[in-house]
C-alpha cells in the first residue's frame, strides 16, 4: 500500500525557528551560498524564500536532519537547493510525510514579502506560470515526491486562517509514495497527461495532479490546473490562488534536490 500523506499545517513564514528545532540533529549542507539547517527558518530570495519546513520532525529519529540553501538569483529566476536525511522514530508513523523543503512565493500562514503578485482570484483571467529544472539525488532509497504545492484561500488576505483547498502537482515520486485520496480522472493539462486524485477526508480538500510521465524539467501554467478544478470539480472560482510552492515531500531517506532554474510568473 502506498503511504498516505498526513497533511500539514505549515510553519508561519516569518518564523526563524520553532519548537521543532531541538528535535533534529543539524548537519550543514556542503558549501552553498547561504544555508540554514534550522527548522522553520528560511533564506530570502525576494520575492521568493527557501523554507526549511520540517513540520513533522517530532516524528523523526534524533539523528534526522535537513538543510536548505539559496545559490543565485537573476531577476525572477532563482537557483536553490536542499538536502536531508530522514527516518521515522516509530513504524506507526511511517505513512506520515516528515518534511517539505521548498521555494515559497506568496502566503504560508503569513507573508514574507508583499510584492509577489499573489493572490489572484481564480475568476480573474490572470495566469500564473512556472518553469522548474532540477536534479534529484538519492544517497539512500527515498520515499518522496517532487511537487508544486499551491494554497487556495477564500480571502485575498487569509492571515493565519486555514486555506479552502490545496492543489498539488506531482512531477516525480518514488519509494511507494502516493497522493492523498482516490483517483477520479486522467486529464490533459499543458500538453501532458495527469492522474487527478481528490481527498475530502481532511481539514480542507486536497487535489493532486500526478504526472503520468515523470519529469525533471517542466514549464507549466499553474492556472490551467485550477481551471480544471473550477470547471469540472466544484472548486469555487471566487477563491484565490495565494501561494505557489515547489519542493520535495520526504517520508524517509537521504537525498538532495538542486533546483538549477526556477521561476514563477504572475501575469
Language-model regions, residue ranges each:
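Solvent-exposed N-terminal domain segments of exported/luminal and surface proteins
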Residues: 34-97
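Extracellular-facing segments of soluble proteins and assemblies that are Gly/Ser/Thr-biased and enriched
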Residues: 98-184
Amino acid at each position: 500500500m502506498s503511504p498516505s500523506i498526513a497533511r500539514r499545517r505549515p510553519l508561519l513564514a516569518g518564523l526563524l525557528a520553532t519548537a521543532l528545532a531541538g528535535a533534529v540533529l543539524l548537519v550543514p549542507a556542503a558549501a552553498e551560498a547561504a544555508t540554514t539547517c534550522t527548522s522553520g527558518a528560511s533564506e530570502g530570495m525576494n520575492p521568493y524564500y527557501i523554507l526549511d519546513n520540517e513540520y513533522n520532525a517530532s516524528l523523526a529519529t534524533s539523528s534526522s536532519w535537513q538543510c536548505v540553501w539559496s545559490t543565485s538569483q537573476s531577476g525572477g529566476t532563482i537557483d536553490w537547493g536542499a538536502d536531508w536525511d530522514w527516518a521515522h522514530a516509530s513504524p506507526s508513523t511511517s505513512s506520515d510525510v516528515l518534511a517539505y523543503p521548498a521555494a515559497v512565493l506568496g502566503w504560508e500562514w503569513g507573508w514574507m514579502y508583499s510584492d509577489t503578485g499573489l493572490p489572484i482570484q481564480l475568476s480573474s483571467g490572470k495566469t500564473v506560470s512556472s518553469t522548474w529544472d532540477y536534479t534529484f539525488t538519492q544517497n539512500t532509497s527515498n520515499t518522496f515526491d517532487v511537487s508544486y504545492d499551491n494554497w487556495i484561500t477564500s480571502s485575498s488576505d487569509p492571515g493565519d486562517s486555514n486555506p479552502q483547498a490545496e492543489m498539488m502537482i506531482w512531477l516525480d515520486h518514488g519509494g511507494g509514495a502516493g497522493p492523498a485520496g482516490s483517483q477520479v480522472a486522467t486529464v490533459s493539462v499543458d500538453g501532458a497527461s495527469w492522474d487527478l486524485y481528490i481527498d475530502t477526508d481532511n481539514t480542507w480538500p486536497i487535489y493532486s495532479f500526478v504526472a503520468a510521465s515523470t519529469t525533471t524539467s517542466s514549464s507549466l501554467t499553474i492556472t490551467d490546473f485550477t481551471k480544471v478544478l473550477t470547471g469540472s470539480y466544484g472548486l469555487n472560482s471566487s477563491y484565490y490562488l495565494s501561494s505557489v510552492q515547489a519542493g520535495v515531500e520526504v517520508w524517509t531517506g537521504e537525498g538532495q534536490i538542486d533546483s538549477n532554474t526556477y521561476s514563477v510568473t504572475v501575469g
